Swiss-Prot record:
Family: Belongs to the eukaryotic ribosomal protein eL34 family.
InterPro entries attached to this UniProt entry: Ribosomal_eL34, Ribosomal_eL34_C_sf, Ribosomal_eL34_CS, Ribosomal_L34e_arc-type
The organism of origin for this protein: Sulfurisphaera tokodaii (strain DSM 16993 / JCM 10545 / NBRC 100140 / 7) (Sulfolobus tokodaii)
GO biological process: translation
Top-level taxon of origin: Archaea
Protein name: Large ribosomal subunit protein eL34
């Protein structure tokens, strides 16, 4: 039976074979997916995905409008559209 903190689904099991020939299970934290833009679905730049508890709020994502949600190109187009009055 694994330790209680390894029973969470945030850990994945890795079956490894030891040099003695015995097989054992190692536990590793799951990796998060890349953050993608909500409009064009391209990966976002400057957004951290793993071990988020180590970083402050401003280190996790850019500090502009919609930072960490849409990419800079889509934001640029959105601002242009709103300033020109079209929707």
């Amino acid at each position: 039976m694994p330790n209680p903190h390894y029973r969470s689904t945030s850990y994945r099991k890795i079956h490894t074979k030891l040099p003695s020939g015995k097989s054992t299970i190692h536990y590793e934290r799951r990796k998060n997916n890349r953050a993608v833009c909500a409009i064009c679905k391209k990966p976002l730049q400057g957004v951290k995905t793993n071990l988020l508890y180590k970083y402050s709020k401003t280190e996790k994502r850019p500090e502009r409008m919609y930072g960490g949600y849409i990419c800079y190109k889509c934001l640029e187009n959105l601002i242009k559209q709103t300033l020109r009055g079209s929707s």
